[in-house]
Amino acid sequence: MSNKLWEKNFEVNKEIERFTVGRDREMDMYLAKYDVLGSMAHITMLESIGLLEKDELEKLLAELRHIYQLCEDGKFSIEKDVEDVHSEVELMLTRKLGDMGKKIHSGRSRNDQVLVDLKLFTRHELMEVVDNVKALFDELIQKSDQYKDVLMPGYTHLQIAMPSSFGLWFGAYAEGLADDMLYLQAAWRMTNRNPLGSAAGYGSSFPLNRQMTTDLLGFDSMDYNVVYAQMGRGKMERNVAFAMATVAGTLAKMAFDACMFNCQNFQFVKLPKECTTGSSIMPHKKNPDVFELIRAKSNKLQSLPQQIMMIMNNLPVGYFRDLQIIKEVFLPAFDELNDCLRMAAYIINKMEVNDHILDNPMYDPMFSVEEVNRLAAAGMPFRDAYKKVGLEIEAGEFVANKNIHHTHEGSIGNLCNDKIQALMEQSMAEFSFDKVRNAEKKLLDI
């Protein structure tokens, strides 16, 4: 027996069904508990406009809370002959409560149902991404403060350039994450808007109370225009993917630096041996596989916006099955990004730095700019000072003065980490996480 919500008086060819269902059941497992939350808000609204009796609502809510708990406990599954999570939840309600379970779809389409599922899922995952970005940020700031006076070479073109410090290096990636948080804020604002009530993209003749479901689910506002609510499918995922890719870009660059600085030719940083891997043939090897995999996974994540754009590239207004494929690249991406963020925070915490790098005379030429500046400050024209020091270097006569004195904002001697922390705290304060958590707890009666 088939359990399709749209079934009429004919059967679909089995090969067509296999191809069109694809990985929907697998992907919908990501959305299961959010489908339940959306249904709880929807039926509460239906009761308020007279489409459900109060006792029906209470029974349906109780059963939906039970299904939600099954999802939380890992005991929920989508049966083989059931198309998707929406069908499975409705089927479970109908089996338990009879015709009452068939009433929950009034004023709703699977189109706006999956839209709200995706918004609720993405909202939850963004909360975790933000928390993990903040945790990594805190580790980087701590390391920056700890090693603020330890000098290291700065590079341009991979050539020794000017003095830098571990305070600057760790702090640079911390500020990068503070900037990335602005993209996550934009992603959150777009995500935290309610599409429920747009039905198949053209609204409903039922007198739906969309503001009520918006409040029940803790959304900041709604996607007002019902056509745009459907057009937002794919656009939301793409813009969230851009935010994720921005964070991934910061991770990838940091991982490259760490791999390079860890190698024997640099020896700027050291990883505990328990955080490295070995070789099957070379007994001396201690490889920074963690950073290499963070780099690769982060580079992969940076392709996500382009994948989504190409899937939805030439779609006109309205729903198309193409949009289902976005789930396959979008939904699993959060696990990958969060895993990279957690591992980066862990490994940064364990990282040790070499505080005697500049004892090696090969780094002396990078103090040439400091000498040029001293001569210029003493009155020599800058170009003359530049030429004088350059000739000394070429003649092997340059003697490095390593007593550097930088005082301006953001320099070796004035990292401004407190300002960077203030930027991050300001960003964190603008997320409405507590509102969301409280709304969901109230809906679940916990």
Which functions belong to the PLM regions below?
Residues M1-G38, D99-M100, Q267, M282-I446:
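Glycine-rich cofactor/substrate-binding loops
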Residues M1-G203, L208-T214, S221, T277-G278, ...:
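A helix-coil-helix interface module used to build multimeric assemblies
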